[in-house]
UniProtKB/Swiss-Prot annotation:
Residue spans, zinc finger C4-type: 39-60
One family name in Pfam for this protein: Ribosomal_L37ae
Protein name: Large ribosomal subunit protein eL43
GO MF assignments: structural constituent of ribosome; zinc ion binding
Keyword Zinc: yes
The entry's keywords: Metal-binding, Ribonucleoprotein, Ribosomal protein, Zinc, Zinc-finger
Gene designation per UniProt: RPL37A
Family: Belongs to the eukaryotic ribosomal protein eL43 family.
Database matches in SUPFAM superfamilies: Zn-binding ribosomal proteins (SSF57829)
Length: 92
């Protein structure tokens, strides 16, 4: 393992290189891409990133397409809520 500090966290491996603001941006992306997410199918926190945009649940084995660094992108959440709203309007 590479040397890390409490403040730098996952980007401690970069040391003093690349500048503080770029390391902060990278830290946000790397923390989100390495964390576990909630599976909509089985209800467990077991979804992890397999590759860029491919997310798989270790509990139930489902594979889902998502964002590069997060499971759900902001635009996908907006589209999903819009579809749900339109579906409710047509049903009533």
């Amino acid at each position: 393992m590479t040397k890390r500090t409490k403040k730098a966290g996952i980007v401690g491996k970069y040391g003093t290189r690349y500048g503080a603001s770029l390391r902060k941006q990278i830290k946000k992306m790397e923390v989100s891409q390495h964390s576990k997410y909630f599976c909509e199918f089985c209800g467990k926190y077991a979804v992890k990133r397999k590759a860029v945009g491919i997310w798989g649940c270790k509990a139930c084995g489902k594979v889902k397409a998502g964002g590069a660094y997060t499971l759900n992108t902001a635009s996908a959440v907006t589209v999903r809520s819009t579809i749900r709203r339109l579906r409710e309007q047509t049903e009533s």
